[in-house]
Amino acid sequence: MKRTYQPSKLKRNRTHGFRARMATKNGRQVLNRRRAKGRKRLTV
């Protein structure tokens, strides 16, 4: 059986990266929540 997690840096960044988050209103809300919480890393 093939494992479900097949790492790819490109896919990771396109789906969860900073530019991807900034592209949508909800993504920006995610970033703002994480900033408010004081996360060291905002994305990936």
From Swiss-Prot:
> Keyword set for this entry?
Ribonucleoprotein, Ribosomal protein
- State the GO CC annotations: ribonucleoprotein complex; ribosome
The record's section on Pfam families has: Ribosomal_L34 (PF00468)
Gene3D superfamilies, per the entry: 1.10.287.3980
Q: Which NCBIfam families match?
A: rpmH_bact
GO biological-process terms attached to the record: translation
Per its UniProt entry, which superkingdom is the organism in? Bacteria
UniProt name for this protein: Large ribosomal subunit protein bL34
* Gene Ontology molecular function terms on file: structural constituent of ribosome
Q: Which family does it belong to?
A: Belongs to the bacterial ribosomal protein bL34 family.
Region called Disordered, residue ranges: 1-44
Query: Bias category Basic residues: which stretches?
Result: 1-19, 31-44
Report the InterPro entries cross-referenced here: Ribosomal_bL34, Ribosomal_bL34_CS
